[in-house]
């Protein structure tokens, strides 16, 4: 407080450049160039010439929503005279400003004394409590007054363009609003305004309906064109006039009212001054005290809620009624708390708030389209079935409102019911398109049938088909069980080599050998199935070979099997090789059998080879043999059989002499190879040199050379 009195609270005022820049930003460049004193004199003369009846008629007949009309001009003239008289040094310090009896009583009170001008308002809504918190004003409520005592000073000031007094502030050494330097009586010393500079105040923009509401300040706000410094200078001029009055004059009944608080402008200082607490019947705080401590927060929240108006054009009428009742309750609650006059006294502002910010974005035709789309959703011949909970909820609300209306007195309100257009609903059965023999299909969906996208075709099947499919499923499951059982036996047999290497004693070795024989016998029995002797169950073996895991298992089992049983396995494989090749198109697992088949073929005799070659070539037609030879495993197996035959014939053993059956089978295979094109022949897994040498035994020179050139160019090994 001492720093404000001494003038040390505004160190920035010492910098002239900042002040000039601030004045230019506030008033505009060249605002003080014109003769503002001459304008004051001219406006004062105009005011004296106006008759009192004319002023009264203009004040009473002006509309409420005319914020910048004739009333503001009258207020401007009165303020001009105030400023002019305040600046005349000939007036005594304690003199009162007298006016003619013809002036409007709504502007000048009955005691013919000018009352302190109330502070201006900014355009934003601020409650008195927020101003007290922000500027540190005193919290003493002003005395109430009648509505007839509200003068033109409570009205909004004109814009800068129409008021040279406000737009062009006087250039003087001491700013307007500086307290007078003359002495005062002891009773008045406690209420001196200590702020040496113009003030910058924000206040509430509305007054309440009751005349004794402390939160009511002004009816209309300042125009938005006025800068904060201009408003502060106006307040400073009024403060000087009020300070020149004696304490006895403030005690008169016509002069009581809130007075200006001392607040330093935020634009020119870093802190806010405080006001001396009022004593006795001296100065009152300029801004009133709110009716409750939480009035500021509550009013702000209510304003924010009222500004947000949801678009309820598409809602149920019950929804609209509920929202309207809530709005009425808020307005009543706001009127009880002293803030309800804001909307009733400002119809222009209320109309502005009600204006839809999104108006004009849609054409009327587009709005009708949206309404029709929304009504389509409400069309229902059975609302309780389509929207059961919605209907019951609003039935309960209607019953509750009816019961409340019965308890009240007055006319009964008619219930609003939603009326939707009646649309004839045609009952029809949905029949999707049927495709015979298909598992599922996509059908055309619609709004009435959105879920029926897939309709499974129910095809009638005979008992024979079902029995056959069941047998196939059971057979495949049985084959998988057999493969797992044989694999477990195979793993045990392969593990015996490790166990033999770890065995040291002979007795233990014999035990392991016996156990190995048992495991091998179990494996052979599984391959034979129900067959007797050294024969393999052909159907079971083919099912095993149709599964990729079974093929790899057979390739590992063949070296462990006895020779006769292994030869039987090769014979069945050669006999069904064309079928196995077709089943192996995706797996491509047959080539893994080539190495183990070669080990078994090296132990077979010529009659066994003849039987195997006959199963491969003789039992099939020429076309089937061509298909086998175009497969990599089939061509490799043929080369391996011919290579073993060449070895037996080259050994000179009389038991291994060529037989007529063997010769015819070799010639048949050679002619088939000559008919297959070079591009169709695959690359075998073994060398064809030995096979070509064996072919030369039974072919002439020409065919032998052709076959040699074809196989050599195809395989690239010659």
Swiss-Prot record:
UniProt GO BP: deadenylation-dependent decapping of nuclear-transcribed mRNA; negative regulation of cytoplasmic mRNA processing body assembly; negative regulation of translation; P-body assembly
- GO molecular function (one): translation repressor activity
Mind listing the UniProt keywords for this protein, alphabetically?
Cytoplasm, Nucleus, Phosphoprotein, RNA-binding
| Basic and acidic residues compositional bias, start-end | 144-157
* Composition bias type Acidic residues, residue spans: 9-23
One matching Pfam family: PAT1
List GO terms (cellular component aspect): cytoplasm; nuclear speck; P-body; PML body
Q: Where in the cell is it found?
A: Cytoplasm, P-body; Nucleus; Nucleus, PML body; Nucleus speckle
- At the top level, the lineage of the source is Eukaryota
Region spans: Disordered: 1-30, 139-188, 327-347
Q: Does the keyword Cell membrane apply?
A: no
Q: Which InterPro entries match?
A: Pat1-like, PAT1_dom
List of residues that carry Phosphoserine? 62
According to its UniProt record, where is this protein mainly located? cytoplasm
Instruction: Cite the PANTHER family for this sequence.
Output: PROTEIN PAT1 HOMOLOG 1, TOPOISOMERASE II-ASSOCIATED PROTEIN PAT1
The text of the family note is:
Belongs to the PAT1 family.
Q: How does it assemble?
A: Interacts with ribonucleoprotein complex components.
What does the record give as the function of this protein? RNA-binding protein involved in deadenylation-dependent decapping of mRNAs, leading to the degradation of mRNAs. Acts as a scaffold protein that connects deadenylation and decapping machinery. Required for cytoplasmic mRNA processing body (P-body) assembly. When tethered to a reporter mRNA, able to repress translation.
Protein's recorded name? Protein PAT1 homolog 1
Chain's gene name:
patl1
């Amino acid at each position: 407080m001492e720093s404000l009195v001494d003038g040390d609270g505004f160190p920035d005022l010492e910098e002239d450049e900042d002040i000039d820049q601030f004045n230019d930003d506030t008033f505009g460049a060249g605002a003080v160039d014109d003769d503002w004193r001459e304008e004051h004199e001219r406006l004062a003369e105009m005011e004296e010439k106006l008759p009192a009846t004319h002023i009264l008629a203009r004040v009473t007949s002006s509309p409420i929503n005319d914020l910048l009309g004739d009333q503001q001009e009258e207020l401007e003239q009165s303020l001009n005279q105030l400023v002019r008289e305040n600046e005349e040094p000939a007036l005594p310090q304690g003199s009162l400003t007298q006016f003619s009896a013809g002036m409007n009583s709504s502007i000048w009170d009955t005691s013919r004394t000018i009352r302190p001008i109330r502070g201006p308002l900014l355009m934003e809504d601020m409650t008195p409590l927020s101003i007290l918190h922000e500027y540190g004003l005193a919290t003493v409520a002003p005395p109430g007054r009648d509505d007839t005592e509200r003068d033109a000073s409570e009205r909004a000031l004109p814009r800068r363009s129409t008021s040279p007094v406000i737009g062009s502030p006087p250039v003087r050494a001491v700013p307007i609003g500086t307290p007078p330097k003359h002495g005062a009586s002891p009773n008045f010393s406690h209420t001196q305004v200590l702020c040496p500079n113009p003030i910058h105040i924000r206040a509430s923009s509305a007054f309440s309906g009751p005349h004794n509401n402390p939160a009511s300040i002004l009816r209309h706000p300042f125009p938005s064109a006025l800068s904060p410094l201009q408003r502060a200078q106006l307040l400073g001029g009024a403060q000087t006039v009020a300070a020149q009055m004696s304490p006895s004059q403030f005690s008169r009944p016509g002069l009581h009212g809130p007075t200006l608080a001392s607040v330093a402008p935020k634009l020119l200082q870093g802190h806010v001054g405080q006001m001396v607490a009022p004593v006795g019947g001296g100065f009152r705080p300029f801004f009133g005290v709110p009716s409750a401590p939480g009035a500021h927060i509550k009013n702000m929240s209510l304003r924010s809620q009222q500004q947000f108006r949801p678009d309820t054009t598409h809602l149920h009428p019950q929804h609209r009624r509920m929202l309207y009742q809530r709005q009425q309750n808020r307005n009543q609650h706001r009127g009880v708390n002293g803030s309800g006059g804001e909307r009733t006294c400002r119809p222009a502002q209320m109309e502005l708030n009600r204006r839809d910010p999104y108006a004009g974005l849609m054409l009327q035709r587009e709005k009708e389209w949206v309404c029709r789309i929304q009504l389509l959703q409400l069309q229902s011949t059975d609302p309780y079935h389509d929207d059961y909970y919605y209907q019951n909820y609003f039935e309960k609300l209607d019953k509750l409102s009816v019961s409340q209306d019965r308890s009240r007195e007055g006319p009964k309100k008619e219930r609003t019911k939603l009326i939707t257009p009646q649309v004839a609903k045609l009952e029809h059965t949905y029949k999707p398109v049927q495709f015979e023999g298909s598992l599922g299909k996509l059908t055309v969906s619609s709004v009435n049938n959105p879920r029926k996208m897939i309709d499974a075709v129910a095809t009638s099947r005979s008992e024979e088909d079902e029995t056959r499919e069941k047998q196939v499923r059971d057979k495949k499951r049985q084959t998988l069980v057999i493969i797992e059982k044989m694999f477990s036996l195979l793993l045990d047999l392969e593990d015996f080599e490790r166990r033999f290497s770890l065995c040291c004693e002979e007795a233990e070795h014999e035990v392991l050998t016996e156990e190995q024989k048992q495991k091998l016998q179990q494996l052979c029995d599984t391959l034979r199935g129900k067959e007797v002797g050294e024969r393999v169950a052909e159907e079971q073996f083919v099912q095993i070979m149709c599964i990729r895991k079974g093929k790899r298992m057979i390739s590992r089992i063949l070296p462990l099997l006895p020779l006769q049983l292994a030869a039987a396995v090769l014979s069945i494989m050669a006999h069904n090789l064309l079928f196995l090749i077709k089943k192996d198109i995706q797996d491509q697992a047959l080539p893994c059998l080539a190495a183990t088949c070669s080990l078994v073929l090296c132990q077979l005799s010529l009659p066994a080879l003849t039987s195997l070659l006959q199963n491969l070539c003789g039992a099939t037609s020429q076309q089937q043999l061509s298909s086998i030879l175009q497969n990599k495993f089939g061509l490799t197996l043929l080369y391996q059989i011919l290579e073993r035959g060449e070895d037996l014939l080259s050994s000179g053993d009389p038991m291994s002499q060529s037989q007529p059956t063997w010769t015819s089978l070799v010639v048949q295979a050679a002619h088939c190879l000559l008919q297959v094109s070079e591009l169709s022949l695959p690359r075998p897994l073994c060398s064809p040199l030995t096979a070509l040498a064996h072919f030369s035994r039974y072919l002439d020179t020409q065919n032998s050379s052709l076959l040699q050139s074809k196989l050599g160019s195809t395989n690239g090994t010659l």
